[in-house]
Regions:
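Short, glycine-/Ser/Thr-/acidic-enriched flexible segments
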Residues: 33, 153-154, 176-180, 187-190, ...
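A short secondary-structure junction signal
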Residues: 4, 37-40, 184-187, 197, ...
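Electropositive, glycine- and tryptophan-enriched low-complexity nucleic-acid-binding patches
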Residues: 160-208
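Flexible, glycine/threonine-enriched loop-and-boundary segments that flank and lead into catalytic domains
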Residues: 147-166
C-alpha cells in the first residue's frame, strides 16, 4: 500500500500536478475503514458459530450427538421477532438457549478431538477458540468478537447522528491542503485516541515524500488532535476556510 502511494506521489510530482510547496501542507484526519460484515447481533453470531462448528465436524468426520440443524435457525428467527416487538425478556431467554446450544456443540467437538490427526486439530483449533469467545462474551465486555471470520473488526463510535457505531478499523488519512492528493494512509488497530495517531501519520507521510525531497511543515487537524505537537511541523487547529490555501496560489 505504501509503495503504491509513493509511486502515485512521484508520478504527480513528475507531471507537475503538484509542487513542493503544496506537498508540504497537509490535512490529517481519522475515519473508520468499515468491514463488509452483517450487523453483529448476539443471536446471529451464536447461530453462525454453531453452523461453522457443525460444518467443520462434518468435513473432518467428527460425529456429533446432535447438530441442532432445525432448532438453531428457529431460535435465531424467534430472537429477531422478539427484538422487533421489543419483548426483550423473551429475547434474552432465547439468547440463553442459543448460548446453551452452542456450548453443547462446542464441548462435543472438544471431547472428540483425540479422534482426529494433529493437522486437522490445528486447523479446527482457531475456530474453536473464536466460538469459545462468542460463547463466553457478554454485552459489557471489552475486546469483543464481532465477526467469526474477521476477528480484527472493532466497534468504533465517531459521534455520527446517522450511525452511532461503525464496525471496522480506525485509519488515518493525510491529503494535500490544496488539491487533495493522498500522501498518507495507514490503519491504527486497537482504536487509539485520535491525537495519539498524529505523530505516526506524519511520520509515514514524511517517508512517502522522501523521493521528492519534501517534508510536511504544516498539518491542519481537527480538535481531536489539540494539545499535540510534532517536531518540525506546525500543527494548526480551528482553521477557517478562508485561511486554507487556494489552488491558484499553490
Amino acid at each position: 500500500m505504501e509503495e503504491l502511494l509513493a509511486h502515485t506521489i512521484n508520478a504527480a510530482h513528475a507531471m507537475q500536478a503538484v509542487d513542493a510547496r503544496e506537498l508540504s501542507r497537509v490535512i490529517v484526519d481519522t475515519t473508520v475503514q468499515e468491514k463488509a460484515i452483517a450487523y453483529p447481533t448476539d443471536s446471529r453470531l451464536l447461530e453462525v458459530a454453531r453452523k461453522k462448528l457443525v460444518l467443520l465436524a462434518k468435513r473432518h468426520g467428527i460425529g456429533l450427538r446432535q447438530s441442532y440443524a432445525r432448532q438453531g435457525p428457529a431460535l435465531s428467527r424467534k430472537a429477531g421477532r422478539y427484538a422487533h416487538a421489543r419483548q426483550f425478556k423473551r429475547m434474552q431467554r432465547v439468547l440463553r438457549r442459543q448460548r446453551t446450544v452452542l456450548g453443547r456443540v462446542l464441548r462435543d467437538i472438544q471431547r472428540k478431538l483425540d479422534q482426529v490427526n494433529t493437522g486437522v486439530r490445528e486447523r479446527i483449533a482457531i475456530w474453536l477458540e473464536r466460538a469459545q469467545q462468542l460463547y463466553t462474551q457478554r454485552p459489557k465486555d471489552k475486546q469483543k468478537l464481532y465477526a467469526l471470520h474477521a476477528p480484527e473488526v472493532e466497534c468504533i463510535g465517531k459521534g455520527k447522528a446517522r450511525q452511532a457505531y461503525e464496525f471496522g478499523v480506525k485509519v488515518g488519512i493525510a491529503v494535500t491542503a490544496c488539491k487533495g492528493l493522498v500522501v498518507g494512509a495507514r490503519s491504527f488497530p486497537g482504536n487509539p485516541y485520535d491525537g495519539d495517531t498524529l505523530a505516526e501519520q506524519l511520520e509515514q507521510t514524511r517517508g512517502l515524500l522522501q523521493d521528492v525531497s519534501v517534508e510536511p511543515t504544516v498539518a491542519i487537524v481537527d480538535l481531536g488532535d489539540r494539545g499535540r505537537e510534532v517536531d518540525g511541523v506546525q500543527v494548526l487547529h480551528r482553521v477557517s476556510v478562508l485561511a486554507l490555501p487556494r489552488c491558484r496560489t499553490c
